[in-house]
Amino acid sequence: MEKHENVSWMYQQELKDPFKKYLNNTDDYLALLCGPRRSHLFLPVTAVYALIFVVGVVGNLLVCLVILRHQTMKTPTNYYLFSLAVSDLLVLLLGMPLEVYEMWRNYPFLFGPVGCYFKTALFETVCFASILSVTTVSVERYVAVLHPFRAKLKSTRGRALRILGIVWGLSVLFSLPNTSIHGIKLHYFPNGSIIPGSATCTVIKPMWIYNFIIQVTSLLFYILPMTVISVLYYLMGLKLKKDQHLEADKVTANIQRPSRKSVTKMLFVLVLVFAICWAPFHIDRLFFSFVEEWTEPLAAVFNLIHVVSGVFFYLSSAVNPIIYNLLSHRFQAAFRTVIPPSCQQQHSHNHSPGPSMQRNIFLTECHLVELTEDVAPQFPRQLSVLSSQLPTALCTGQVPRKELAKS
């Protein structure tokens, strides 16, 4: 995340210029200009970050591993979830350590202009890639629910990879404006000499440029996408509710609906959690961009928002694997194939499966296939095009890949 609290502190201190000449101590003068060298919330926030780091890194590595390892997990939808996991790992492994270091030592910034550009570009790129990935998977799910035959033809792995290439390319491109206005700022004594250890990574161009960029990107990469996503899931909800009242093709519905509803439910929860976790981040940025004159009460409110937004920002990088494990039986089964047996045995003693949640899972050396998300009630013996070949084909491993690559 971008560090704004020191910037707001600097603006407050511009009103106190007459008192600067009375400060002869370098540390005191630097503290007046840049604020405290170490955040007073360093210890509690670091403890929270450490927990998020462990859960997020382990969880997202598992997500990446099961998608790469199991052929049947390489679906278009899972490719978008893989992209989210990669962006989360970038934030946790590269962004969080920088954030913790800056909380421990706000200044000087030790990594030079290149490090400043990298830090800014990283957070901007991940921010844009995450929301674009969530938007894309929501559009794919919308097509799969409302236009299933079109999705069957067009929703392919190759298409998903091409879309993800565009997503990450656009994310890097749109990160450049904000990155270009950041740099290393040095502070000076009244006599014009540089204050030792005063280098900070911050905005070095006129603030109106920064404010404009933040307001535009918040609109394009949060407000508009979340509005579109909300409409899409509303329409999907209407469609799924309508399907519940249809009596025709009971066997087909019995096979398709549980999986379709389960995946849609999981993605809806994913989007909802994403929106909640990222809202403070954008509130933080917009708050800073709209304040023209800083006062102590405004600075106090902003600093509180900044801390909360930081926790939720990193929390969003850790919760996705938990959502997959809770709401997707396919991911649950895949996780079991990569988790050490000792951990699985301990978990099985505490959570024995009940009869109401039976699953038909077939594990081979290269495949992990789940027939249905939940066991649905049995209908009288009827056959359809979909139901006639599904059980035997799965058991013999002769199902074409395109049949297994369900969204």
Curated annotation (Swiss-Prot):
InterPro entries: GPCR_Rhodpsn, GPCR_Rhodpsn_7TM, NeuromedU_rcpt, NeuromedU_rcpt_2, NMU-R2_C. Residues 1-47, 101-120, 184-211, 284-298 are extracellular. It is a multi-pass membrane protein. Signal peptide: none annotated. GO terms for biological process: neuropeptide signaling pathway. The keyword Metal-binding does not apply. One of its GO terms (cellular component) is plasma membrane. It holds the Pfam family 7tm_1. Keywords: Cell membrane, Disulfide bond, G-protein coupled receptor, Glycoprotein, Membrane, Receptor, Transducer, Transmembrane, Transmembrane helix. Receptor for the neuromedin-U and neuromedin-S neuropeptides. Belongs to the G-protein coupled receptor 1 family. This is Neuromedin-U receptor 2. The lineage of its organism: Eukaryota, Metazoa, Chordata, Craniata, Vertebrata. The gene is NMUR2.
